[in-house]
Amino acid sequence: WNTYAFFVLYANIDEFDATKYTLEYDKLSVMDKWLLSKLNTLVKTVDDNLANYKITETARVLDNFVDELSNWYVRRSRARFWVKEMTQDKINAYMTLYTALVTLCKAAAPMIPFMTEDIYQNLVRNIDKSAPESIHLCDFPEYDEKLIDKELENDMEEVLDIVVLGRACRNTANIKNRQPIGMMYVKAPEALSDFYIDIIEDELNVKKVEFTDDVAAF
């Protein structure tokens, strides 16, 4: 609900209308592509789970997706919504988040019928009167295998693991996140790309992150 409220707040300020834009995959940032990959993986998993009556597993994957959507994608992307001009990057952020919210609601509607209906009425019916009158009259979303990038998902998962461990190390050493650290070593056979390293450095307030498979010196 907080992510939905975030979207509505800035969409109202910018008078953003999703029907006036299309989601152009080739123009998206890595974060956008990651979210769309996770979204399509979610739809695929939920569809399979519901077909096999795995209700608990369905609730768990929906909860995990909402957590990553709110606490990772939105938090890492919110500055894009603060830009005054309606740049292509800002449009991409709006369209990616809009697509995620609407698709998530359709996938979660059997589990959360009233909240998803409320969100659907505002995000979809409010701007498209030709859309089905209720979210429960919509087709269940279909996943697009071409948008699922497991390598991207795995790399971002590694980033999330490193950030969580880094925060735990800071807490153990009683070093607040606002205090910068000169160097952080990560034990791994291969280094991540600079894009991911930049995220780690920003999240943990570290000047430099170095990947090494040899930790004998430490």
PLM region descriptions:
Residues 1-218:
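Feature 926 captures the class I aminoacyl-tRNA synthetase adenylation module centered on the KMSKS loop
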